[in-house]
Amino acid sequence: VMNMWPGVKLRVTEGWDEDGNHFEDSLHYEGRAVDITTSDRDRNKYGMLARLAVEAGF
């Protein structure tokens, strides 16, 4: 993220769900999922953010 968008940070908004905010079969209940965004919350970056996550092995 820092190489793609200088000054923008990765934000983890949720990793483990205890409150039941996700679908019943969500991997959040097993601690195997994460919700992420960027510090500037620019939705136009989300497609590239997903590609970067896949390239990093997530």
UniProtKB/Swiss-Prot annotation:
Pfam hit, one: HH_signal
Residues engaged in binding Ca(2+) 1: T13, E14
First-listed, main subcellular location of the protein, grouped into a coarse class: membrane
Positions that bind Ca(2+) 2: E14, D17, D19
Annotated function: Intercellular signal essential for a variety of patterning events during development.
Domain text: The desert hedgehog protein N-product binds calcium and zinc ions; this stabilizes the protein fold and is essential for protein-protein interactions mediated by this domain.
Name of the featured protein: Desert hedgehog protein
